[in-house]
Amino acid sequence: MNVDGIVPESVLVFEVAGSVDSFIKAAKKIEGFEWIGELDGEDKEPDEDFANLDSKGQDKKYNEKFYFVMSNQRALQQLLSLWQIYCDKGQFDFGLAPFRTLFEQLKDVRLWNEIDRLDEYGVRDKLEELAIKETSAVKVQIELWFSSSSEKRSARELQIRILTEQAGGRIISTYQNVDIQFHAIIIECSAATVKQMLEGSAPLIKANEVQWIRPTGQVIDKVISDENAEIERIFDYDTNLIETSPLVALLDGMPLENHTMLRDRLIVDDPDGWEENYLAADRKHGTAMASLLIHGDANAPWSPLTSRLYVRPIFRTNIEHEECVPDDVIFVDLLHRAVKRIMEEDVSKTVKIINLSVGDSSRLFLHSMSPEARMLDWLSFHYKVLFIVSAGNHPSFLYLNGTYGSFKEKAQKEQMSIIYKHLQADKRNRTLLAPAESVNCLTVGALHADMSNPCVMDGRINPIPSLMPATYTAIGGGYDRSIKPDLVYRGGKLLYNEIYADSMDATLRISKISSRAPGQMVAYPPNPTSIAYLKGTSNATALVSHLGAYLVNIIREIPLLELPDNLMAIAVKGMLVHGCSWGEIGEKLNECLGTNGRMKKRSISNWIGYGMPDIERVKECTQQRVTLIGHGTIRQNQEVVFDYPLPQCLQSKTCKKRLTITLSWFTPINPSNKIYRKARLSFSPKGNEITDQRQEADNNAVKHGTIQHEIFEGKKAIPYLEGKNIEIVVSCGKEESMSENIPYVLIATLEVAPEENLPLYNQIKDRIEIQTHIRV
């Protein structure tokens, strides 16, 4: 059911107190109401994202809310009446058993009201903080129920304007977008009005037109540092540029353009004129991210970007000198304007990658797609540009059971298990930060790793080894159980303060010292030679964007590929993931978490996605590792077959063989539909007897996003005839009716261990003649 024309009075809230899985099954058996959220018609299992699972992975009781739209007012009133009868009597007349089964799982059934409008994670706390801190005017963002009718949108906006002015406030800005079905207004009102909203008495909080009320100016994925991080360091970098047209854009804070690590390497585009009031000392996040994007970790710098970096400031500093989205700007509107300018202006239309190291701590992903994520999804498909987005930071104390003495006495493996189980138990409060749930973007989590030299601990402890998931990184998964984050990369080692009394509670507090290692060394204000050591998923994201720019140049040099320009971003996305595997990280993490079966796969992918990318594996072939790349467009209900020729040297050969296949694409979206992802592409290898065992990620979860990455292995000696191929069938399944042609890139690598000394490359090269067979 498309809900773009929702009548606000038709939205029901179901508070679940029983089994979520049982509730979903019972709800599906009753006609007349539909999900607002993500239930998209595919078979579901209990999901630990909105249901607690016991040690066996089974659904157990947890209070949760779901939102439904009734098909008509009469049905709505009947359902409310039945709920009241059930509450009063606990039983029904004959024929109403399905309702009894449904109600047995519920704590409450009611209309959408003022409770729900402030019910998103952390919103109430942030508004309370604003109401206390501000003595005069407070800005809040009101998100309205979207209507496909422009007349209804205007009427709803007028009603909010009237109520705002009656409360002594004023309208600051408004934004409507039909493509993502979003309608929002920023108002300025008194702190007293905000307090009345929190109490549920303000007319604005009771208005049927309102879906959500939120604080403004929140979005930034803050780096983990102290306030006086900078130290001086002189660097001598190669300043030669191969090309001036940018491949990568950075949407972030204003950078320190005259820093020695950034000088003559940036194109700063500031159409809003924010630079004038952006003090040099406050230009922290943008300077650090630009530094990482251009040079990587300065502890062991990479070859710098060969093209200029385009920078568009989307942050300003507030009165407390914090970098954030301005409180008078609707962030979705700012994103839309910034990306449209990048992709349509001559100076930056060469951009293929947009780095977005941001995360809204008041928008944790639970079920529904945030408007920011919807905007990224729409923009990526419309402009064929890859957004690389940080998963989000959750830097918090570790409240571990027992005393510090008992924790300290344990072996490191036991300490790791305690820490990761503690973080996993708090998963609900550590999920992705918007817009990281975007299905088209590449979402990056962080590993506890950097290139810093061994450092003096100086009252700090490092309880986990390098290249394990960082304790601050957000935990996935994504929309409709897709793999999120997509991958992980070095984000910097975060240490904790030593506890000097063994009898004290084992509460590990973060060390925010940034003037010395560990951490990634970055350019930092206020001076042209200042540096700092920082940590965060922002850092990991910037490093992956650097790798993406490197891959653009690699792809351009592949002979005979003939990749259309509108497929470059999709190819980069696929190649970044193609080199990923769980490896030792996955093994150690699973030992810490102690999960098994499908829960093992899901838990690991929620932490590290498909793993850490190894660019060396994808940038070139060897005699024992051969990568083939295919591309094209596909439409609904179509199949395309790619032939991967098998070398004769593997015929009846007993050795470990690995086949890695990655399919990447961008999907158009149904922004307010239970089937959000319109293009459901997938691949299936046929005739793959030599590597018939799936490894790592769950084979169902990999099909729920816009990148399917699978690893197949085998050791058996399998006979086959000369000229045999593995058929890789790419299909586009039917979701909702879809008229768009979907561009995609398919990457396949067959390999054996180098010591096998088999001539895979030569034999495949001799046979290669990529042919595609189209089936409709």
Show which residues each predicted segment covers.
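Autoinhibitory propeptides
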Residues: 1-13, 25-138, 158-238
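C-terminal edge strands of extracellular/lumenal beta-sandwich accessory domains
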Residues: 677-690, 718-776
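Catalytic-core environment of secreted peptidases
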Residues: 253-272, 447-461, 468-541, 558
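Extended low-complexity, serine/threonine- and proline-enriched intrinsically disordered segments
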Residues: 8-50, 140-144, 151-168, 657-706
